[in-house]
């Protein structure tokens, strides 16, 4: 029997809630399947809202042989060469004004500014989202003035959903909605990235690179921030326990996240 080959496939997967169950590490079954996939000619890239640094521990032992997408589409980075290939940035003083208003009007929120190298938390440690301590984030607790002159890639607010609805109104009031893309990555996570930025948009950049020309894109994701990625793919896949928005954007529904998704893909899709 001939060994199955994947020389024409580019597999792009979200991490949290797709490849990795919440608050856990990647399963051995997924690791083995991914490495078998790349050994047989497949190309694999991660697509995550995480920083490269916080994603790396979850990718330990996996062959990531294509540039990966970070900050929900604001960065494309080749991890093997530690080289940033593309970034999208939040430009203008309006972002500093918006951040100051959010800090003043939502004192219980966890407010984070992401630069290429760091996650800067602008709020007291008492407000920290639990994921910061448990998911390999290198956190810099600081203040807005300290990061005003940095180059921002992503602005993130963790708060109760009702409060985030008022943050959205504030964004409209200040015109932030006209100079950004915003989305929920969880019910209590509201994120702002540069205009026309998404995992899907950066995946188009990756797909167009000469090294991957002609490969079919198989993409996996579980939440609204994955929807464009799922739609741009030749085959978009969402776990059974994904959000309704993600499932509506997908072509195929995989078993729930706790069941390893990559063996299922290799068995059911190819």
Regions found by a protein language model. Give the residues of each.
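Conserved acidic, metal-coordinating active-site core of Asp-based
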Residues: 108-220, 224-225, 229
């Amino acid at each position: 029997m001939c060994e199955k080959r994947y020389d024409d496939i580019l597999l792009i997967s979200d991490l949290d809630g797709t490849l990795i169950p919440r608050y856990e590490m990647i399963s051995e079954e997924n690791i083995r399947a991914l490495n078998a996939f790349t050994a047989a000619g497949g190309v694999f890239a991660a697509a995550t809202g995480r920083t490269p640094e916080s994603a790396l521990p979850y990718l330990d032992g996996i062959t990531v042989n294509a540039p990966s997408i970070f900050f929900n589409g604001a960065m494309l980075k080749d991890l093997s060469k530690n080289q940033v290939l593309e970034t999208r940035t939040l430009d203008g003083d309006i972002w500093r004004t918006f951040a100051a208003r959010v800090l003043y009007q939502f004192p219980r929120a966890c407010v984070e500014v992401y630069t290429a190298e760091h996650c800067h938390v602008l709020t007291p440690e008492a407000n920290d989202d639990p994921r910061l301590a448990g998911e390999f984030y290198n956190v810099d607790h600081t203040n807005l003035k300290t990061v005003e002159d940095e180059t921002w890639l992503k602005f993130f607010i963790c708060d109760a959903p009702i409060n985030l609805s008022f943050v959205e109104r504030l964004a409209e009031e200040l015109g932030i909605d006209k100079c950004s893309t915003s989305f929920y990555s969880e019910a209590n996570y509201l994120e702002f990235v540069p205009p026309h930025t998404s995992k899907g948009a950066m995946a188009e950049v990756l797909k167009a690179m000469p090294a991957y020309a002609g490969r079919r894109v198989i993409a996996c994701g579980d939440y609204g921030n994955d929807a464009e990625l799922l739609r741009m793919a030749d085959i978009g896949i969402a776990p059974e326990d994904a959000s309704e928005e993600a499932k509506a954007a997908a072509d195929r529904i995989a078993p729930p996240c706790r069941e390893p998704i990559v063996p299922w893909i290799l068995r059911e899709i190819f």
